[in-house]
């Protein structure tokens, strides 16, 4: 068998372990992809991966192999209204941090209701805005989340936008961030949001990973979060910005592997 043919076979085997999965949250339909490990255990731990602002489920696939090798099922999804590329709902004018939190809670409860899931091992992994949403979710349903992984979490979102829109009357009907239109609702909600007042309600193990060249999220916020959580550590990736590439991503995955062993 040639190397090319072998690669195609391996890609096919990997694809067979992935399936599209829609999960409902009331009237909201959430699109995602579920990846299963190559073992026959009846119950598996599960990791739910939450993308950042204007991201998509595609970002979560970076975690599949590492987590599948550890025996985890992995679910990566598109937040409804969370991205112009969302297959769930791409109307970003309705983007909402609290809406995303409710969607993530619905996903957690879906998996906890499945017979092949080890309900004592449900892990949340959140990137950027998805990190904020994951932290809020873990604080709201702490007994349902076994471990929390935050990659460059945007805990700064309320402070950042409140410095721009100091009072509710300042908020326009439409704001564009990186050419993504966002409605009044998003900014009205975060105006009153104080993540550091609530995130420490989660008492389980926490891993925060961030690059020391991140220009979007302050390292001070991550250090503050680590100090607040009961059991947490911060891993800093030298030279990495807001998001990881290549060797940076591999370093992050190694940290996640060690954290979940």
Where are these predicted regions, by residue range?
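Hydrolase active-site cap/lid region
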Residues: 136-184
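Catalytic histidine-centered segment of alpha/beta-hydrolase-like enzymes
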Residues: 240-251
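Short beta-strand/loop motif that positions the catalytic acidic residue
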Residues: 202, 208-210, 214
